[in-house]
């Protein structure tokens, strides 16, 4: 799954990592952090339920769909289908939301620049969730 090349680099098997998420979760997302540097972090995460409109104050976000498909909305625009192989990008403080389309796992590879602290989740409607109900980190490499 992970092999250290040297103290400054590594190799991750995303196809293998995306199969290791639990079948169900008590949070909206479960993630596996691959890197966690101040300048940027990289994660693989699975979505378990529709994710209400929210934003992050600290980082720009790059999301590559590595499994499944879902509906995605950025900045109150139109919903569009996000599917495997598509890269989605948005700047910090951009509102976004995700809806599941079927019962297949929806998994993303995410790069946050700079690193996004786990507490940096702000729901448009605060009643929709908290950092604790939003995401759980399954494993850090």
Sequence positions of predicted segments:
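A short, N-terminal "cap"/entry segment at the start of jelly-roll beta-barrel domains
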Residues: 1-45, 52-53, 123-141
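Residues that act as N-cap/strand-start positions at coil-to-secondary-structure junctions
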Residues: 26-28, 82, 92
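Conserved hydrophobic/aromatic beta-strand scaffold that supports enzyme active sites
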Residues: 34, 42-46, 62, 79, ...
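A generic "binding-loop/recognition-motif" signal
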Residues: 40, 49, 58, 78, ...
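Tight coil/turn sites that cap or link beta-strands
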Residues: 48-50, 84-85, 91-93
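Short glycine/serine/proline-enriched coil/turn segments at secondary-structure junctions
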Residues: 54-55, 89
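A short beta-strand-loop-beta hairpin characteristic of the jelly-roll/cupin
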Residues: 56, 62-84, 94, 99, ...
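Ligand-binding loop in jelly-roll beta-barrel domains
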Residues: 92-120
């Amino acid at each position: 799954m992970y092999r250290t090349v040297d103290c400054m680099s590594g190799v991750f098997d995303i196809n293998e990592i995306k199969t290791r998420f639990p079948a169900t979760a008590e949070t909206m997302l479960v993630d596996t952090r691959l890197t966690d540097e101040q300048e940027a972090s990289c994660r693989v995460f699975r979505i378990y339920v529709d994710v209400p409109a929210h934003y992050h104050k600290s980082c720009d976000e790059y999301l590559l769909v590595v499994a499944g498909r879902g509906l995605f909305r950025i900045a109150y625009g139109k919903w569009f289908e996000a599917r495997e192989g598509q890269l989605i990008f948005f700047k910090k403080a951009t509102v976004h939301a995700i809806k599941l389309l079927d019962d297949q796992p929806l998994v993303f590879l995410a790069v946050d620049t700079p690193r996004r602290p786990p507490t940096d989740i702000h729901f448009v409607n605060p009643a929709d969730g908290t950092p604790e109900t939003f995401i759980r980190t399954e494993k850090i490499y």
